[in-house]
């Protein structure tokens, strides 16, 4: 016998979290719980405003439609909404024992705030020093100077940069001008520096700064291929789709010599712990990009190891639908 429950959550965000054009005040979504033959599985469905094509309401409706069919014994097709497809596929993988428990809780820390404090923190990091800097929010020249200072001050640091397609080619060149050519090989990659993929490829060729595809991975017709200057693809499962789709992309990337990086879409601690398990399972040699836990004021049901943040319990959540 199959039973299914959909729980709704709304967690307060820390002040100052801005996504493109709006301030994000709460993180909204659903936990899906599947039970069959004494086994159970869970997943998180949490479309990200400004980035997901679906709203939370649309995701909830699609999840209920899928759960109704599954509860009656059908094997419904994957939802066309990426956040729903991903969350349900995680629940099915747990239910069927296909999602390993071991996890990669390493994080590439997100660098923001006072550069002097950052340098101290980065120098004190143990193990492989990989960090991330969001760029493109301020002047390109300023971004270049900050990146250069970090690379100069921490000699064993490797940086992942993310520009979210925010620059013209001229602005991207302004950034590169302020990064010492001797340090550029320690930029692991710069995600989508320019507004078009052609401009980004030309930027990589002309500057020697490696790039990665992020938004492009979710564009219709995207093919994983080896290209000069491209070193990685970034996979954000909540925005991409089911585990099967993520596996397909990771396999294709590895087959052509590209790194595949599992990255957060500001999931709750519940979703982040599942992403850490997926990263350990599918991309064990790569540090995932999961340093977003502290953007939300509370954890959700499952704790992130070592975090002392308060936890919202399952019995505090509203039931959106139950079979």
From Swiss-Prot:
Pathway: Quinol/quinone metabolism; 1,4-dihydroxy-2-naphthoate biosynthesis; 1,4-dihydroxy-2-naphthoate from chorismate: step 4/7; Quinol/quinone metabolism; menaquinone biosynthesis
E.C. code: 4.2.1.113
Gene3D superfamilies, A to Z: Enolase-like C-terminal domain, Enolase-like, N-terminal domain
Biological process according to GO: menaquinone biosynthetic process
Keywords per UniProt: Lyase, Magnesium, Menaquinone biosynthesis, Metal-binding
SMART domains named in the record: MR_MLE
Domain of life: Bacteria
Active site: 134, 236
Family of this protein: Belongs to the mandelate racemase/muconate lactonizing enzyme family. MenC type 1 subfamily.
Role, per record: Converts 2-succinyl-6-hydroxy-2,4-cyclohexadiene-1-carboxylate (SHCHC) to 2-succinylbenzoate (OSB).
PANTHER family linked: O-SUCCINYLBENZOATE SYNTHASE, O-SUCCINYLBENZOATE SYNTHASE-RELATED
NCBIfam families linked to this entry: menC_gam_Gplu, PRK05105.1
Family matches, as HAMAP family: MenC_1
Record's protein name: o-succinylbenzoate synthase
Organism: Photorhabdus laumondii subsp. laumondii (strain DSM 15139 / CIP 105565 / TT01) (Photorhabdus luminescens subsp. laumondii)
Lineage of the organism: Bacteria, Pseudomonadati, Pseudomonadota, Gammaproteobacteria, Enterobacterales
